[in-house]
Structure formats: structure tokens, C-alpha cells
Amino acid sequence: MGRGKIEIKRIENKTSRQVTFCKRRNGLLKKAYELAILCDAEIALIVFSSRGRLYEFSNVNSTRSTIERYKKASASTSGSAPVIDVNSHQYFQQEAAKMRHQIQTLQNANRHLIGESIGNMTAKELKSLENRLEKGISRIRSKKHELLFSEIEYMQKREADLQNENMFLRAKVAEAERAEHDDQQAAEDDEMAPAPAVGGGSSSGTELEALPATFDTREYYQPAPPVSMLAAAAAAAAAQYSSDHHQTALHLGYFKVDSGKGGLL
């Protein structure tokens, strides 16, 4: 079974790149040696590794002599330089043509994606385009739904945070209102309470202080009765007391002692 085709591009792995360089360098030197022997050609080969190390091969005295011969040939031959320039110009023209073709292909593909320039497409190409569009739309919808779900989840979390913050603020406001109401009620109670008596005193003094400011003692003032009226009142009171005392003694059954005898009156 033959060896598979290797894609020519830079080897990313450093170790693999170094191993490949050593193998292919030896192969290149071998090919140069064989070419010099088989064709009797003067060959000078110069190679610099990625680390800057120099490798050279020459089938003559030295590589420097071959380089000097090259310089002399370039200076004496006027047609050699234009040949190199023509080759370079042709190379860049080919590369530019490739780039233009790639740009045209990409532009056509973009037009096909929006439904333009599809008149010359075959049924197979249209079916392939349809499949690609469906896959693209499916991926776009999936990504859109993912973003929407993420946004909804974020908004729900934000809503919960705002509700918690609102409840906290309501509790703070209610607490402040209760404290203000309690302070106001305490102030009203202090205003309604009577002032204490200064230096102590009887209850009558406190009651007099509690009387309204409009109290007028002149309304309760009455002149003293004359002396004769006082004497008559005192005599009546004494007579009444004597009568009451005599009746009480009769009802209680007092014993009266007479000539050394006792008996119930």
C-alpha cells in the first residue's frame, strides 16, 4: 500500500518540525550530491535552520567559490536578470488570478444565500444550498433560544432581588413609622399628665393645683354668722345630744344603784 500524500504546510509541533527538518535536510544533501555526480554539475547548497544554524554543501572546493562564479555570471549576462523578473511577474499574476477567482466564488456564494444569482444552478446545487440554509437557520435559532433563555433567567433573578429589596425597604419604613408614632404618643402622654407638687404637700393641695385656671374662690366665700346665732345653735345641739343620750340609756337597760340596791329601771 502506497504512502499517503502529505499536506505541505508548516508543522506546528516543535519536536516534529525538528525531526522532519533533519530527515529532509539529509535527503536534500543526498539529492544534490547525486545530481552533481550524475550530471557533472557544479552545485552549492546553503541551508539555515529555524534556530539559525548553517548547513552547506558544495561539490567543488567551497561554496564561496560557487557564489563568486554566480556573481560574475549575473554581472556579465544582461539577460539573466530580466528572465528572473519575468518569472516573478508571471508568478504574481497567477496568484492574483487565483485570488480574484476565490473572491468571485465567495461573492456568488453570498448571493446564493440571499436567493440571488440562482438562475443557472442545477437541481442538485439548489438542494445542497437548501440543506446548508436549513442547517444554518437551525443553528441560528438554537443560538437565539439559548440567548433568550439566558436573558429570561437573568431577568427572573433580577426580579427576585428587587422583590427582596422592596420587602426590606417596606419593613424599614414600617419600623420608622412605628417609632415615630410611639414617640408622638409618649409626648402626648407627657403633656396630659399632672405636674408633681413642689416640696411635698397634702392631697388637698394637689387637688387645688389640678383645678382649672378659671376657678374663682369668691364664688365660694360666705360671711360668718353672728355670735348670737352661734350660741343658739350650740344650745340646740347640746339639748339634742342630752335627749339622744337619755334615750340610748333607756334602751340599753342600765342598772341604777339606789341605797345599796341594784335593780333594772
Swiss-Prot record:
Signal peptide feature range: none
Subcellular location per the Swiss-Prot or TrEMBL entry: Nucleus
InterPro entries: MADS-box/MEF2_TF (IPR050142), MEF2-like_N (IPR033896), TF_Kbox (IPR002487), TF_MADSbox (IPR002100), TF_MADSbox_sf (IPR036879)
Basic and acidic residues: bias regions: 175-184
Organ and tissue specificity: Expressed in developing seeds.
Functional note: Probable transcription factor.
Protein name according to UniProt: MADS-box transcription factor 21
Native source organism of the sequence: Oryza sativa subsp. japonica (Rice)
Taxonomic lineage: Eukaryota, Viridiplantae, Streptophyta, Embryophyta, Tracheophyta
Gene giving rise to this polypeptide: MADS21
